[in-house]
Amino acid sequence: MVKRQIPQVVQEANAFINGQGYLGVVKSLTIPKIEQETIEAKGALGGNFASGTIKPVEMEFKLSVLDKNTYLGYGLNTWNNRIPFLFKASVFQAGKGAPEPFSMAVTGDVVEIDPGSFESGKEMEVSIKLAVHFMDISIGKNQLAMFDVENMICLIGGVDYLSQVRSNLGE
């Protein structure tokens, strides 16, 4: 028998930049996509095959507030130690009881702050784009993915797919 999956709904979201919360002004969050580098096999029947490497990851989020802390994050990440970005949400799914927590911790370089256009009577939309160097995504008590570029760790579903690569390199 086929069992229908019920969609999940984000009830509310919050972002923390260098410890400061942005509850109520998080407009959107694009969760980073994890994408394989591929190589093309040519011939009578060509195809693309995974190369065992992951493309660089970027993410973007939008706030409806422009403040000193967002620009401070740009400066600290560029010329000092990277500051943490933490994204939390409450995710509801009908028939599952209580909503579950979503959590994504990210560090990386702020590559762009786009304050957008100013229009009288309109809500602001400030876009912040990050080049992600560390990411840890969980929903409920389940870690979905964690990767750490600097330490060459890629955990997906609890499996570290780069452990053998580190071992091959003597790490």
Predicted regions and their residues:
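Solvent-exposed edge beta-strands and adjacent loop segments
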Residues: 1-68, 107-118, 156-170
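Short, conserved charged micro-motifs
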Residues: 68-73, 139
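Mixed-charge, glycine-accented linear interaction segment located at domain edges/termini
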Residues: 109-171
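A short, compositionally biased
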Residues: 6-12, 80-86, 131-132
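A generic structural micro-feature
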Residues: 51-55, 77-81, 98-100, 120-124
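Beta-strand secondary-structure signal
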Residues: 58-62, 84-88, 103-105, 127-131
